[in-house]
Amino acid sequence: MNHGRRSAAIARPFLENLGLPADAVNEICYGIAIHVDDEADFEWKRTPFCETVGDADNIDRFDAYRIYETLEYLEFSKMSLGDKQEKVVSTIEKLINFKEMKLGTVTAKKLWIQRLDYYIGFYEKLKAQMDSSSSIV
């Protein structure tokens, strides 16, 4: 809870000790504060730079290990074939919808789409394999 705002409070003294200009410290801290839920506990202007903190966090979260971690958390291996198929289809739909998410920069958007395409490719392959199976235990 309040992960972004607490992280900004931790980062602020460090950034100030680096001797960065106050505007730079505020912009970095604002980006950190809003990166989870778009809320900060201080006023600042939202800039593409601020948005890159959340963008980087989201892009980083969509990697190969997270696929494994998610499937483990869902206890995917214990699901029936039908439940697995439903979960995979709903995941693909969700990932396709994520492509519409607004990001702060063109580069972030390209990286985001690459990560989503990687995930979608994995889940489409998993779906194809399950669709050709009569049972997967």
Predicted segments — roles?
Residues 2-17:
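An active-site-proximal "capping" alpha-helix that borders the catalytic cofactor pocket
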Residues 14, 36-37:
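Short acidic, glycine/Ser/Thr-rich loop/turn "cap" segments at secondary-structure junctions
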Residues 20, 39-137:
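Divalent metal-dependent phosphate-bond-processing catalytic cores, especially two-metal-ion Mg2+/Mn2+ enzymes
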